[in-house]
Amino acid sequence: VITANPNITVMFAPYDEFAKGVKIAVDEAGMSGQVSIYSADISTADIAAMREPGSAWKATAATNPAVVGEVSVRALAMLMAGEDPGAQVIVPPTLITQQQLNDGNITNMEELAAKLPAFAHADVAAPDWMPLPSAPSQN
């Protein structure tokens, strides 16, 4: 796709594993300077790929898997207490940019959660009677 369409300037990958493949293709085509990659989802390996010098992978929107689990347990607790968490419980994604990762010297998921509070917590499925976890300390 990339070599057949040399005027491509932006690629979107709806999943981080797809973004890894797009990045490899862009790198192999020597087009890292002209193509910007945007995606959804993140992992420690993705952070490393985004932070590579000259990386075309510019940003991703993601939710923290630990927070998704936390919210799921809270929604279950609400159901067990006879409360309705709603038909959908949506954990808002966080925009994570290459610049944030580089400026914050973020190299893994733990550092990402510590340095981007929006990635570390979600105020959904949180009734008044349920204590929320403490926000991680910022380093």
Go through each PLM region and give its residues.
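Short, glycine/charged-enriched secondary-structure capping and boundary segments
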Residues: 25-28, 52-55, 75, 110
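Hydrophobic alpha-helical
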Residues: 1-49
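Hinge/cleft segment of the Venus flytrap/periplasmic-binding protein
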Residues: 64, 68-139
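Generic structural signal for alpha-helix termini and adjacent loop/cap motifs
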Residues: 4, 53, 79-83
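Short beta-strand elements at the ligand-binding edges of bilobed clamshell
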Residues: 52-66
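Short, charged, surface-exposed secondary-structure boundary motifs
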Residues: 46-50, 69-72
